[in-house]
Amino acid sequence: MVDFTNPNTLAASVLVETLFRLGLQQAVICPGSRSSPLTVALARHGGIDCVVSLDERSASFFALGHGKRTGQPVALVCTSGTAAANFLPAIIEAHYSQVPLLVLTGDRPPRLRHCRAGQTIDQTKLYGHYPQWQTELALPEPNMDYCHYLRQTALHSWQKCFWPGLGVVHLNCPFDEPLVPLEHARESLQHLAEEFSKEHFYRGLTTFTTMNRGEAISLPVNFSIFSFPSPQLDFSPLGLILVGVMPGGETPSLLTDILAIARGLGYPVLCDALCSLRNYDDGQTALITNYDFLIRCPRWAEQLVPEQIIQIGELPTSKALRHWLGTIDCPRYILNFHGENLDPLQGQTIYLSASVAQVAEYIHNQGFIPDAEQKNYAHSWLEKQRQSQTIIISALADAHTPLMVAQLAHCLPPQTNLFVANSLPVRWLEFFWPANGDHHRIFVNRGANGIDGTLSTAMGIAHRSRGETVLLTGDLSLLHDSNGFLNQSQMRGNLTIILLNNNGGGIFQTLPIAQCEDVFETYFATPQGVDFGQLCRTYGVEHKIITNLWDLKEQWPSNNSSPIRVLEIIGDRHQEAQWLKSLQAQFCCADSLIQ
């Protein structure tokens, strides 16, 4: 639909209709006056789902979460001034985690800037270098030349959400008065309405969707050190595969291709729990989940040194693993989907401009057969994992929160969306999430690793999702974004929040700063003492305290009457930090316990 009421409604309706024809399905709108033309065009379109959010920061993370799950850009709309500035944290996260996002900020016309016109800031390049493309639209004009310009700018903007990788596009949209569709202005554009041919104007516009996640982009010849296949890459040495968070997200085919590579080469796979691969265990791959513990044993760490490493995605989170890798002098090949530097260790890594699918196909076509030495190497990893698992299972009997996290994988329905908050929940998952075949999808905000927007991101993931969505979070992360509960009525879906409440920043309890007792509690642990039952009642959210594993297992299938429910697990961060330290110490001095 094109609205010829006035130049602003014309511009906004042409922009929205063009984006819709390109594939826009979801918008998140923050109320405000200067963005009125955009809001009205989106609300009246009929083909775009619109969520309204009072808080711009919460809105932006809601859009981020939805983009994470769908892989499609979400239009994020706000008015002028500091409203737009509140989008910045989510834009930074979207940039680093490669989530498509189309930001539309309403603005005053240039003549009203730098003269204290009110609610006016400099919004040009407001988000710095984080958008992969940004521009300011020209003021709306009532002519076909402007419509053509707007159509092509919208087309370019949509494509830039996907290319060269998934990311953020910012369109600053200045509007002059009148901002609303007033009928008295319609007559002045009647000639344009008669000239406008919708069939001709939108001819050739078709849905432009994302590339497959994990698909390699075309790179300049000299960008990567080696192309693929490369004569420098020899699959014969003892090899190891590292799998971490995938920039741009994952697909089932990507994960099964990784397993195919591992099976074809006979390489064991050290898989971060923040990658969904742990939930795709096929029983035929040496999938190693306890690596953080077992490489703490000096004898094991020495015995398991590989001759070659293939890294897919980012490095796993484990500090122990990263320290171990820093002591190893062997080639590390990184499959570089989007041309990023994925080596925080600054090692002598070799980037391969290839997709996982290309490597899997190459290995299959070459007919690789792992030799006896490689099979023994993989078996050694599996045997040490078995021994370490015995120690861990015994220790978990004395740990409330870690045990709950370890068992959560067996409680959730298959194909659950699990969003994991940063800080301690990420570590509990890394340490104790088991390999399984339930195909859970793991989501994280590991672009910038912040705790902001945790609840809102999870709600965006849950919105219009067909299955279960679960948020695993600590108390501070949930409190930091408690405004997200205001979007409950807008969310179409269900969200279960597993709240690990240890009354403070549990991650700091595991760091050296915990020894500074005079400042630790007040300035780092920052306990808030919030009654979450009361907080949930304020927002009309179901709340239940989970005291044991049986309680947790009984929560699925869920029958909650409200879109959101909170299952609170109360823990003691002091005891849990000491317990974890003791468990890690067992492996550091484990020669007497293991073979």
UniProtKB/Swiss-Prot annotation:
Catalyzes the thiamine diphosphate-dependent decarboxylation of 2-oxoglutarate and the subsequent addition of the resulting succinic semialdehyde-thiamine pyrophosphate anion to isochorismate to yield 2-succinyl-5-enolpyruvyl-6-hydroxy-3-cyclohexene-1-carboxylate (SEPHCHC). GO terms for biological process: menaquinone biosynthetic process; phylloquinone biosynthetic process. Binds 1 thiamine pyrophosphate per subunit. This is 2-succinyl-5-enolpyruvyl-6-hydroxy-3-cyclohexene-1-carboxylate synthase. Its cofactor is Mg(2+); Mn(2+); thiamine diphosphate. Homodimer. It is an enzyme of class 2 (transferase). Keywords: Magnesium, Manganese, Metal-binding, Thiamine pyrophosphate, Transferase. GO terms for molecular function: 2-succinyl-5-enolpyruvyl-6-hydroxy-3-cyclohexene-1-carboxylic-acid synthase activity; magnesium ion binding; manganese ion binding; thiamine pyrophosphate binding.
